[in-house]
Amino acid sequence: YGVPFDNGAVIGAYRIDILEKAGLTADDFKDITWSKFLELGKQVKEKTNTPMLTVTAGTNDLIMMMLQSAGSSMFKEDGSLNIVDNEVLRKALEIYQELYKAGVLVEVTDWDQYIAAIQSGSTAAVINGCWIIGSITAAKDLSGKWAINNMPRFDDVEGATNYSNNGGSSW
């Protein structure tokens, strides 16, 4: 048996002040696709020199959130790998690469650097489980500078949504 006690529903948290410098609002990021996110992220990067996202290099959290938002996985129901012919995974990797090449997404080496990027203002957004709010609100000087929204969805995957999960706990 198990008892769930934590939720990992994915949120998009956006720095209002950084977006305003780019002529945008957090509402511009509501219910959007990844191609729109890339377009807006380029605008933010160009006008503020701030990337939209920071991720920890070598982790697959963002890819997994993308997959789950489209009802896909790297595993089949029988537990075997679902990689070679996984069209949604291919698209997720392409999006990640586009974000990275455009400077909209930057990689850091570890969790401490990831949290430091969020708390120092060197990233304009965070896409992660809602549990990340604790790390966001720990930076008291940024109080009132964040807005919560949902995550982007795939442009061309049937059934793709702006919702996913990253984590959760049980005992």
Each predicted region: which residue ranges?
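Extracytoplasmic/periplasmic solute-binding protein
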Residues: 1-6, 10, 20, 35-81, ...
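Aromatic-glycine-rich donor-binding/catalytic loop that engages nucleotide-sugar donors
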Residues: 17-29, 102-104
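Glycine-centered hinge/linker elements that transmit conformational signals in sensory
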Residues: 38-44, 79-108, 151
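Short, hydrophobic alpha-helical packing/hinge segments within bilobed ligand-binding/sensory domains
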Residues: 40-41, 96, 114-119, 123, ...
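Beta->alpha turn/N-cap motifs
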Residues: 111, 128-133, 152, 167-168
